[in-house]
């Protein structure tokens, strides 16, 4: 017997329309590549997203056609997230830090039909546009006045001209929630990059999971600064979670130096920020050099690589900011675990609490995980034995785009598991600790040695800004 609840598809268009209706005056603030600060509301963002959808219809793009971006975090990129996916196409975020030949390969492999780019990336686009054979429309994310007179790119149009000719009246289509919504390619350290193709369903469920109190804890009372780029795994899903909860969004654009990030945090009363350790290192150095303090920042999410214990201590003891140590990967949309102390930890001394906080945390609801030995046997959650980390869940890939690399999963009696390539321990409370990447771990004197542990020891020295440990045969 089935339940008698309405079967409403989980679609990304529903997020932006919910935000426009229920959080209509919620702010979205962006530092633009032009240097000024732009601000508007969720209601205005929704209207402009509909203009994007109409512009794509006018181009004749089919359902599931790919629309690529080469862009920083900003309001126009935000509009593309919703206008592209909401209209049934797929937003494909390309990492502009890749080599031009990799960008060409990715764009052609994805069969991108439109490519939208920030003007700071015009030199890259000039180098690749003639080789991107499937792209029929190039769009510069600026107004007509900011578009250079002679770009050398055939048919290039300014974004504001492109959507300015369209109506903001648009009826979002209804379709299968399992339809593709976004595409992001892995780094391709072992060959060509492979695409992770996210669905509407997986993206909405990921937004639900990420907004939970024991995950990122987003709410309408927050002002959120995603420093993690929108071209990398959808900025960890924060734009979707913010629309779901009505949180104020603050986009930093291209200015990611410590001074610029600090000024934006203070000016926009940011309460929650998210980024990789290198960004926070620059911020902390700037603050220390100038004797600065935070007036509103409460929490910062640190992921992308293991957070050094010294950074957690500095944020907590010097600035009163709680670090949420998180872990995930492109193939996981990306959120897997977030570290929050449990009630029983609150009475522990500082050293005992730090032993918990340096871990990557517990699984967000929706993510299942286990560690296995080389023969595939599951290992106990004792916090001591390490093994290969496997995961499964509704926002974790089942295969790569176009089947690249074959079947990536491991299949056993418990289901289909994605091998993360990480080596980890899990303690009895479910706290995950990544001890290494399986390809980085060092064996010396018959013992396995964690490069992460060695790096953290080095970074703890006040004279060391950052460190990387490499194994060298001898």
Predicted regions mapped to residue ranges:
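Conserved AMP-binding/adenylate-forming core of the ANL superfamily
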Residues: 28-74, 78-82, 99-104, 160-161
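Conserved adenylate-forming
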Residues: 56-61, 166-178, 183-225, 237, ...
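ATP-dependent adenylate-forming carboxylate-activation enzymes
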Residues: 71-72, 89-107, 119-124, 247-268, ...
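Conserved AMP-binding/adenylation subdomain of ANL enzymes
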Residues: 204-223, 231-271, 286, 337
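Gly/Ser/Thr-rich phosphate-binding loop
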Residues: 244, 267-275, 285-355, 368, ...
């Amino acid at each position: 017997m089935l339940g008698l609840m309405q079967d409403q598809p989980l679609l990304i268009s529903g997020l932006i329309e919910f935000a426009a209706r229920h959080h209509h005056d919620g702010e979205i603030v962006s530092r633009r590549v032009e240097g000024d600060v732009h601000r508007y509301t969720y209601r205005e963002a929704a209207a402009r997203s509909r203009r994007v959808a109409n512009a794509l219809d006018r181009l004749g793009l089919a359902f599931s056609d790919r629309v690529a971006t080469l862009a920083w975090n900003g309001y126009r990129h935000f509009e593309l997230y919703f206008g592209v996916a909401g209209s049934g196409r797929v937003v494909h975020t390309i990492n502009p830090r890749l080599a031009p030949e990799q960008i060409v390969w990715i764009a052609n492999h994805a069969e991108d039909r439109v490519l939208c780019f920030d003007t700071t990336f015009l030199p890259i686009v000039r180098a690749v546009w003639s080789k991107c054979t499937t792209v029929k429309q190039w769009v510069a994310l600026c107004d007509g006045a900011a578009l250079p007179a002679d770009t050398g790119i055939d048919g290039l149009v300014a974004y504001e001209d492109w959507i300015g000719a369209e109506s903001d009246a648009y009826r979002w289509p209804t379709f299968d929630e399992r339809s593709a919504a976004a595409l992001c390619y892995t780094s391709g350290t072992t060959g060509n990059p492979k695409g992770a193709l996210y669905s509407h369903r997986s993206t909405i469920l990921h937004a639900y999971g990420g907004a939970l109190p024991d995950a990122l804890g987003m709410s309408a009372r927050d002002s959120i600064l995603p420093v993690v780029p929108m071209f990398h795994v959808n900025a960890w899903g924060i734009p979707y979670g913010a629309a779901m909860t009505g949180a104020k969004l603050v986009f930093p654009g291209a200015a990611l130096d410590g001074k610029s990030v600090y000024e934006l945090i203070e000016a926009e009363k940011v309460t929650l920020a998210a980024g990789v350790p290198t960004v926070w290192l620059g911020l902390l150095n700037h603050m220390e050099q100038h004797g600065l303090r935070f007036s509103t920042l409460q929490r910062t999410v640190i992921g992308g690589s293991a957070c050094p214990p010294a950074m957690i201590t500095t944020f907590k003891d010097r600035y009163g900011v709680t670090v949420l140590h998180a872990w995930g990967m492109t193939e996981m949309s990306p959120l897997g675990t977030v570290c929050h102390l449990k009630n029983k930890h609150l009475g522990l001394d500082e050293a005992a609490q730090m032993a918990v906080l340096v871990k990557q945390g517990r699984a967000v609801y929706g993510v299942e995980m286990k560690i296995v030995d080389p023969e595939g046997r599951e290992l106990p959650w004792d916090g001591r034995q390490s093994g290969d980390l496997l995961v499964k869940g509704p926002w974790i890939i089942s295969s790569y785009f176009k089947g690249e690399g074959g079947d990536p999963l491991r299949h056993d009696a418990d289901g289909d598991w994605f091998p993360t390539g990480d080596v980890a321990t899990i303690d009895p409370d479910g706290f995950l600790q990544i001890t290494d990447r399986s390809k980085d771990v060092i064996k010396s004197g018959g013992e396995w040695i964690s490069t992460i542990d060695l790096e953290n020891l080095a970074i703890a020295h006040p004279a060391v800004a950052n460190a990387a440990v490499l194994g060298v045969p001898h």
